[in-house]
From Swiss-Prot:
Residues 2-83 form the GST N-terminal domain. It is found in: Cytoplasm, Cytosol. Glutathione binds at residues 12-13, 41-42, 54-55, 67-68. Involved in camalexin biosynthesis by probably catalyzing the conjugation of GSH with indole-3-acetonitrile (IAN). May be involved in the conjugation of reduced glutathione to a wide number of exogenous and endogenous hydrophobic electrophiles and have a detoxification role against certain herbicides. It catalyses: RX + glutathione = an S-substituted glutathione + a halide anion + H(+). Belongs to the GST superfamily. Phi family. It comes from the Eukaryota. Induction: By dehydration stress, salicylic acid, ethylene, methyl jasmonate, auxin, H(2)O(2), copper, metolachlor, and the pathogens P.syringae and Hyaloperonospora parasitica. Induced by cadmium. Keywords: Cytoplasm, Detoxification, Plant defense, Stress response, Transferase. Residues 89-208 form the GST C-terminal domain. CDD domains: GST_C_Phi, GST_N_Phi. It comes from Arabidopsis thaliana. This is Glutathione S-transferase F6.
Length: 208
């Protein structure tokens, strides 16, 4: 039976999300590079794996799936007996589900815009829009205020142990720590300690 394959780009935050999950679970996999600058993600054969033309795509033998958060949840459930537990049970699982929604709808869209403006645009020879950065930082600050309160109650966002909720934030945070937006994390003591914790995990270091 064929093993696990991840089709993506190493700089993609969504791809990194999946790779971190696999490293957390100590699961072997094959990484298949999809070159975004050549538009490979919009052509066959990749488009057959994800018709929306976005990385990553994932295969576990005959099982195929896309969308990074769906993939990480599959990994966490399918390999629950391996590596670190990224889930919980009962009411705590509902807290994890809520946290995943908050990260997906509140944290990631804003964080990704800030990564685009401050990291990716300069790489492409484009100019950072400072007005957009200011607007998005104001939005991110509100999300981080919620996180700061939550982290004052528990070590991690959904539990006293590291879960998918924390994992999903890592790729965007890794990029933002190299930008002036880092100040928003540093200004909040609980958030700052949490960021230092999750970004220093071996799984996170492996995707840099």
């Amino acid at each position: 039976m064929a093993g696990i394959k991840v089709f993506g780009h190493p700089a993609s935050t969504a791809t990194r999300r999946v790779l971190i999950a696999l490293h957390e679970k100590n699961v072997d996999f094959e990484f298949v590079h999809v070159e975004l600058k050549d538009g490979e993600h919009k052509k066959e054969p990749f488009i057959l794996r994800n018709p929306f033309g976005k990385v990553p795509a994932f295969e576990d033998g005959d099982f195929k799936i896309f969308e990074s958060r769906a993939i990480t949840q599959y990994i966490a459930h399918e390999f629950s007996d391996k590596g670190n537990n990224l889930l919980s049970t009962g009411k705590d699982m509902a807290i994890i589900a809520m946290g995943i929604e908050i990260e997906s709808h509140e944290f990631d869209p804003v964080g990704s815009k800030l990564v685009w403006e401050q990291v990716l645009k300069p790489l492409y020879g484009m100019t950072t829009d400072k007005t957009v950065v200011e607007e998005e930082e104001a939005k991110l600050a509100k999300v981080l205020d919620v996180y700061e309160h939550r982290l004052g109650e528990s070590k991690y966002l959904a539990s006293d142990h590291f879960t998918l909720v924390d994992l999903h934030t890592i790729p965007v945070i890794q990029y933002l720590l190299g930008t002036p937006t880092k100040k928003l994390f540093d200004e909040r003591p609980h958030v700052s300690a949490w960021v230092a914790d999750i970004t220093s995990r071996p799984s996170a270091q492996k995707v840099l």
